Amino acid sequence: MRLSLDSFRAGLHPGSTYRVAFSGGLDSAVLLDLMCQVRRVSGIGVRAIHVHHGIQPEADAWSRHCAAVADRYGVALDILQIDGRSRPGDSPEAAARTARYHSLEASLDPGDILVTAQHLDDQAETLLLQLLRGAGLAGLAAMPNAVPFGAGILHRPLLRFGRRDILAYAQERGLSWIEDPSNRDERYDRNFIRRRILPQLAGRWPAVAANLTRSAGHCAEAAGLLDRLADTLMAAATAADEPGTLVLEIVQRLQPDEQRLLLRRWIHKRGLRAPPAKLLERIRKEVVETAGDRTPMIAWAEGTVRRYRHRLHLLPPSADFDASWTAAWSGETPLTLAGNGCLHAALCPGPGIDPDKWRSGRITVRYRRAGDRLEPAGRRGHHELKKLFQEAGLPPWLRDRQPIVCIDGRIASVGGSQWLASEFAGAPERVNIVVHWTP
Ligand SMILES: Nc1ncnc2c1ncn2[C@@H]1O[C@H](COP(=O)(O)OP(=O)(O)OP(=O)(O)O)[C@@H](O)[C@H]1O
């Protein structure tokens, strides 16, 4: 489609404040020019944002170029300084991109529309890259035209226009831009596809970019439908008294493909990246489908799926929890438990620790040790903590994480004030020390 002010405006997502992601390259130079023209005719607010990655030696010169261009348009430019370096083993391209998107996302105010300059050929490259990675529908949907992003929206108004139309527009308008030398580096997959593969395909199928983009559109529609189906399955399977937990029996009644869809959505909604397909299938077979009363679990880098008492639980990783940790506590100020929330103590009416015993003893906090026993307040006889936890239906993976408050080395309370030792418990009708645990 020919790129003109009218054809561009016709597809622009409605809004009143736009932030142009301006790298200084050809595509975003055209986008900024178009947005400034729209501003002239319709009075929208336009600001530009440039991300300074601090990686390439030219980064300072690019920032200066962007500032000069923005100045000529009379547009305010925010320069976001980020550390776009990758960690060993990560792709530098992906690390810079992730850091850039995070900083752009955080910079938006409510209602802002962030516009970026990806076009039809970028979309075709993205689809090919996703196919080569073996992506599922969500990946093949490639880049959406508009999605919620931070406090605002991310919108790509040039997706309908090809690289050639964008170049023609820039030349016609006499725009200036900078060329990033790394765009020619064919060690990067995207550059290889753009420079070697797509021209070959276009020699035989001139409409290749438009057709691939159309396929991405079909995938996007199907992916949206499946998301809605997954939400319906999840609403039906979620335990009413424990949001975030699924009722095993309901999940088991679904077909295998529905189970996979539901598991992926459940993990995604928790903000975790789904495991690879093979591992997801193991979760389905070994955790969901296994018969009997077993309590299987499967962990991957992003989390753990566990089955316990007819429910499925999803836990984020807990890297810094140390079961051998112990500390003295004044009881006056909250105590932070590494990787396990915090404790605080307050005087409250009702069951709790006798304030006199609390003040006169030496308080320490630790975790469970083999053979720990307790006589619960109001009950006769000592019981192993393990038995008390089982009796209360506490899932096994939470048992070692219950903080144990000791007075002079003897257990006074467990899990905040969930279990109180009779030897330290105050009279329940009086005001006592209540230990709260916020995991
Ligand atoms: N340094 C930058 N500062 C501000 N915006 C940028 C910067 N780099 C890129 N952008 C914005 O992102 C768009 C896409 O850039 P580019 O194609 O280089 O990114 P990419 O790494 O391939 O990411 P994507 O997959 O989103 O296209 C640009 O057109 C521009 O709008």
Swiss-Prot record:
GO terms for cellular component: cytoplasm. Its EC number is 6.3.4.19. The keyword Iron-sulfur does not apply. It catalyses: cytidine(34) in tRNA(Ile2) + L-lysine + ATP = lysidine(34) in tRNA(Ile2) + AMP + diphosphate + H(+). It is found in: Cytoplasm. CDD domains: TilS_N (cd01992). Its main location: cytoplasm. Keywords: ATP-binding, Cytoplasm, Ligase, Nucleotide-binding, tRNA processing. It is an enzyme of class 6 (ligase). ATP binds at residues 23-28. SMART domains: TilS_C. The N-terminal region contains the highly conserved SGGXDS motif, predicted to be a P-loop motif involved in ATP binding. Belongs to the tRNA(Ile)-lysidine synthase family. NCBIfam families: lysidine_TilS_C (TIGR02433), lysidine_TilS_N (TIGR02432). This is tRNA(Ile)-lysidine synthase. It comes from Methylococcus capsulatus (strain ATCC 33009 / NCIMB 11132 / Bath). The lineage of its organism: Bacteria, Pseudomonadati, Pseudomonadota, Gammaproteobacteria, Methylococcales. The gene is tilS.
